[in-house]
Amino acid sequence: MTVPDSVGTFAAQAVVAFRRAKGAPDSLALDLVGLTVDSVTAPGASRAARQERRPFAYDGRKLRIGLRPRRGTGVESVVVFYHGAPADGLFLRPDARGRPSAFADDWPDRARDWLPTVDDPADKAPVRWEVSVPAGWRVVANGRFVRRDAAGGGRATWTYDERSPIPTYTMVLGAGRMTASRHRPAVLGNDSVPIEVWAEPEDSAFADSVPFRRATEIVETMERLVGPFPFEKLAEVESSTRYGGMENSTAIFYPEQPYVARRLSEGVVRHETAHQWFGDAVTERDFHDLWLSEGFADYFAVVVGAALDGDSVMRRGVAGLMRGYLRSPVVGRPLVDSAETVLTRLLNANSYNKGACVLHMLRRTVGDSAFWRGIRAYYREYRDSSVSSADFQRVMERAAGRQLGWFFTEWLHQPGYPQLDVAWRWDSAGRRLSIDVTQTQPAAWGLFTLPALTLEVAGGSGPPIQRTIALSSARQSVQWDAPERPTDVRVDPDGDWLLTAQVHSQP
């Protein structure tokens, strides 16, 4: 790919490798939007014809390439020569200080605006970049840095190679006048992961000392919790992404504005780093299962923060996730919302906050040992591939040694959350406390099962008394001895469950 010296068009040739499925037609369809296709070639039928032109049809959205009749089951390839000014996906524009730059930004389906691909999260592929830029520029991209070659005309070509299959929405490059610093590598056993911080020169000191100060420790913590880092390096990059952070494989892009304002937080860094495991290495097969990416990243941002800074981070973090969901406009829709057709609308509190809370509640349901056994098995089994919520459920059921269909049905496919009315009364004659718990959420949300709901009763001179009940019906009553009248009854005092509760006493 040739990136221009200033804002304008680019030119590229893409080598697309593929295998034909049995019975597939003698053609290849690629997503490519709004560019000019100059020609398409493929290896010739003989050694004398090393490359030959292939017929193609291009309607501005789909590129259909005619292929020779299938000659086996091996890997084939075509080369697409094209150019243009992308309307989206690859942004050739000035950086925050007015210098020319180029940055890709592909989620959810904008790789097709500049790359001829099968632009679908279920179709992952390795990628190799050879990017020609002005000699004073630097280039960052997916994978291992291979080399920088000087070229004529005051230009240089940078080569990167990512050998693991990654989703097209994380296939990116960034180019411009940037600085790059190396932090201490992340080490797990005999493996070492280079950690790089890329920024505009004016922002490099801030980037190194504030948001990415513990970038290495974050990676090492994730490795201990989940498994080995899945790629060759991790670069933290100041860019022109439209998102608060974009988890591109091996090269996370962050927007310029928080750098300029000196407000980029470590919480965002933990979230995006967690995506390297969940989203990049293990990718949702369908965007309606986006919680497998965003919910995981939100939860592990909190878990890693707690591992680094103490359990209070866990309590505050989970409580914040729950508050964010309960205040959101999507509580009336299921987490896995297959009716939503606008993909960007899936970037909501269901996919993020509720998805993270589902993991926390699953952990409370099966216990720490089974939860972590399942998480590690899930990553190990599905690394470098694509998954569904059903795949995750199967792994967790195996780890827990029991069926969890009720849990995933209620929390993924039913909308809403439990709304509880909790009425208590104290019998002074019998010294007994009675508590009635009623689910009052809209009928369309259905009922929820809370297998270990804690009730805490305070009163008298002694410490609060806690009892755990299994709530599995619309209404449940419990009684126990209470020598003194309670002064307070609390529901789920540790914040383990995504719910609301109205507590009141009865005469």
Q: Which residues are covered by each model-predicted region?
A:
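Acidic/His/Gly-enriched intrinsically disordered linker/tail segments
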Residues: 163, 263, 294-361, 365-366, ...
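Beta-strand-rich binding/interaction modules
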Residues: 36-43, 140, 404-405, 418-492
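A surface-exposed beta-strand-loop module
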Residues: 27-28, 32-98, 152-159, 471-485, ...
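Glycine/proline-rich low-complexity spacer/linker segments in large multi-domain proteins
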Residues: 72, 81-128, 176, 181-184, ...
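N-terminal, polar/Ser/Thr-rich
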Residues: 1-11, 23, 96-98, 112, ...
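Surface-exposed beta-strand/loop patches in extracellular or lumenal glycoproteins
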Residues: 11-36, 115-119, 125-134, 390, ...
